[in-house]
Amino acid sequence: MNGERIFAVDAWSDVAITRHQARRLAREHGVEPRRAGEVAIVVSELASNIVKYGVRGEIALHVAAAIDGGLELTVVASDVGPPIHDLATAMLDGHDDRGPIDPALLAQRGGLGTGLGAVARLADGLEVRQESGGKQIIATFCRGLPGGA
C-alpha cells in the first residue's frame, strides 16, 4: 500500500491542484474524510508558503506502511527559497519568522501568519530541515489513518 506523488509548486494554481490531489490520495488509501481534509489543509499551507516565500519548490506525498501495521502519510515541502529566520517565532499565530505581523500589512501579505502553526497542530509530526540551498518541511500523519492509532 505504498504510493508517492510529487507536484511542482510555482504558482497559485499549483496550490489548488496539489491540495486536491493530497485529499484524493488520502481518500484512495482509506483515510476518513475529516482527516483527509486536514492533510489537504497542511498541503495547502505548505504549498502557499512555497509560492509566497520560495523561489521554486515541490510537494511530495508519500504513503507507506507504518511500524504498527497502519498507514503513514508524509508531506514533504521543499523549496530553494530563503531560510526561515526564526522557526519558533514563525510557528506562532500572527507572526512571521521575524516577529509579529503588522495588521495594516495583512492584505498585502496574503495571509494571517497562521500557516506553520496550523501545520504543527494538524500533523502528528513536524520536522524542518534548513540547508544553504533551501529547506524542507516534513509533516507526518499516522493518527486516524487506516490500521493506525
Region locations from a protein language model:
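Conserved ATP-binding N-box helix of the HATPase_c
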Residues: 33-60
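Conserved beta-strand core positions
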Residues: 57-59, 73, 137
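Short beta-strand-loop-beta element adjacent to the nucleotide/active-site pocket used for signaling
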Residues: 63-75
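Flexible ATP-lid and adjacent glycine-rich G1/G2 motifs of the Bergerat
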Residues: 80-149
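Bergerat-fold GHKL ATPase/HATPase_c domain
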Residues: 1-41, 63
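A general secondary-structure signal for short beta-strands and their flanking turns/coil
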Residues: 2, 54, 70-72, 134
